[in-house]
Amino acid sequence: MRLSKQKIRSNYDSAAKYYDFALLLYGIIGIRKAYRLRAVKLLRLQRGDCVVELGCGTGLNFPPIIERIGPEGRLIGVDLSPRMLACAGERVERAGWKNVELIRSDIAAYNFPEGVNGVLSTGVFGYIADYDDVIKAASHALVPGGRLAIMDGKRPEHLPSLVFNLIVRLSRSFGVTRDYFDNRTWESVERYFRETAFEQMYGGMIYISSGTAA
């Protein structure tokens, strides 16, 4: 059963202060930071690009994005949780970045700006019932040749059920249920984008779906 948006926001508000540490614990069981970095790399960003990160959380993906787009680029972080955004704001302030904008919004209701070069999301789309509409909107917002990359989870084909069940249990504080892994976002990416790619890792539980806007 999927949680309401209000419940998801409440869960992440409560988890905001220890979220980064929790992701380190996921690394211990093999869910690696490298997966997120791979998604960023697939955007093929250049200096001066405009990037939208959907579900930016505490801003963990900001450093590799800023490294690529430089100070002349623009990064927009969108998240539903005000406390997660507050943590992201602290990260931005510590780093001294002047080209980052943080927006509190339901991702399904977010209006993309014009002239976007890259759209990134890691560990978010399983919450979004209207994911097809969001991916379609992203395809329209991206400039021709702009890139989308989504890293998320799905039902694994080659991961022992014991491990899958353990991860679901560990993720309950973030509002993750078994239903989270049922969204087939890659099919929407293939519908609205060209030059699509679908990569699987961690026994098929983690995937990265990417594509280029027409």
Regions found by a protein language model. Give the residues of each.
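Conserved class I S-adenosyl-L-methionine
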Residues: 1-44, 60-64, 87, 164-172
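A short SAM/SAH-binding and catalytic strip from SAM-dependent methyltransferases
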Residues: 118-130
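A short glycine-rich, Lys/Arg-flanked "PGG" loop and its adjoining helix->strand segment in the class I
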Residues: 132-144
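Helix-to-beta-strand junctions that scaffold the AdoMet/dcAdoMet cofactor pocket
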Residues: 70, 128-129, 142-143
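A short acidic, Gly/Pro-enriched loop at the edge of an enzyme's catalytic core
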Residues: 108-119
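C-terminal alpha-helical "lid/dimerization" subdomain adjacent to the S-adenosyl-L-methionine
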Residues: 6, 23-25, 149-203
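Class I SAM-dependent methyltransferase SAM/SAH-binding core
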Residues: 52-109
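Glycine-centered, small-residue-biased loops immediately flanking beta-strands
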Residues: 49, 73, 146
